[in-house]
Regions:
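Short acidic-hydrophobic, aromatic-tinged amphipathic segments that line or gate anion-handling sites
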Residues: 102-106
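Amphipathic alpha-helical interaction surfaces in cytosolic regulatory modules
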Residues: 23-100
């Protein structure tokens, strides 16, 4: 079963950076959900999520971000996706989520969204 690898770091200006690699689906979404919950508990609500190495995302995986964006925005933050792979971006488009989330091609562009 494909897995999910996550890396988290804190950038200047209180921005949290998460890099996801592998598969974000019904079997792995709880890992991402737990990481975002931990970041929120630390008071970080500005998230850049790099999806360049994410091979697959299901509706359950995308649902993690749908559930988190309201809390982020309610606390003065947001979620910005950095360099989503074409197949991942297509899932966001098909689910109608591209209108809700911001996407960036460079880290500077992503940081400027805040």
């Amino acid at each position: 079963m494909p897995d999910l690898k996550l890396h988290q770091d804190t950038l200047p200006d209180g921005i949290c950076y998460i890099e996801a690699e592998g598969y974000l689906d019904a079997h792995t979404f709880e890992e991402m959900e737990a990481l975002i919950a931990a970041v929120f508990r630390q008071g970080c609500y500005k998230l850049i999520v790099r999806l360049e190495k994410l091979d697959y995302i299901s509706s359950a995986g995308a649902g993690v971000f749908v559930g988190a964006i309201s809390r982020a925005k309610d606390n003065g933050g947001d979620i910005v996706f950095l360099k989503p792979s074409p197949q991942v971006k297509e899932v966001f488009d098909l689910l109608g989520l591209s209108a809700i989330f911001q996407f960036a091609e460079t880290r500077d562009e992503a940081e400027a969204c805040f």
